[in-house]
Amino acid sequence: DLAAALDDRAPPAARLNTRVRPVPVKTQVGQVAFTVPLRTLTGLRWLTWIAAANNAGSALFDLTWLPTVSWWWVALGWLLLISPPGRMVLTAAGARMLLRPVTPGDYPRGGKIHLRLWLAERLADEMGAANLAGATWMRYYARALGADVGKNVDLHSIPPVTGLLTLGDRCSVEQEVDLRGHWLDGDVLHVGTVEIGLEARIGARSMLAPGARVGARAEIAPGSAVFGDVPEGEAWSGAPARRAGQARGPWELDRPAHRPVWLVAYAAVAGLIAMLPGLAVLAGLAGMAPPFDPPRRLADGGAGGDGRPPPP
């Protein structure tokens, strides 16, 4: 009986992995070559901040030895490379140009489609299109990438660069949900669509695999992994996700009032967050300014510290 019990507790035999072909050398060379222009984008963003700091230092602190450029060039660089809308527009334009031939399906790892997808994701990372400063603009970023976004959608996660995403009206996607819609399995790249239905809710840090479809008013618990279809009005949880009952529905039937003033306020704060590196540069530049000469003490009648009048 003891031997039988121990045998029952033994872990199941794992399936042996198939032989995985390595990434072709030409793809590796291409990735290294594309890294140079990608990193250059980050350098251009910092050059914009440095140019603004040089102009300010030369004008405010009389640091004439600093090289300066026209403020128009600084404004253009800030608009395209630093402001959240500019970064999102450039990223979306580049991603749509790169991923135009990409459709749902299976592709070889290291092939042309994989390289295009890798390049589009690295472009988004280098541009910082989906960082904290752009949280307010996430719905517009998803539309720019080609996603089908319904009305009054609450999107708090990064949309896929492929644009193969459908968000139904009034659905809610919480923070850090994996919506990429693609993954590598050995030497095969799986690319699929992700669909979220009307008023469905996706919990934080969940994953929707390629081809996942969440029905209307369904609920996915936080930390779940969804493979396949979730029927309407059901609650699923776990990894992989399984049916856990009926969806609870919203706490209140009346939706909160949508106030555009808060959207504007959040967008303004996003712009301020994007300016924090520039403020750090200005703080460092202030340390190079000439020392401040305090005025003479009034008690001395404008005289020096020893009571004698200052030299002419």
Give residue ranges: language-model regions:
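Structural signal for interior beta-strand "rungs" in well-ordered beta-sheet cores
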Residues: A142-A144, D148-R243
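AMP-binding/adenylate-forming catalytic domain of the ANL superfamily
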Residues: D1-A3
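Terminal amphipathic alpha-helical/low-complexity segments used for targeting or macromolecular assembly
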Residues: D7, P12-G146, E232-P312
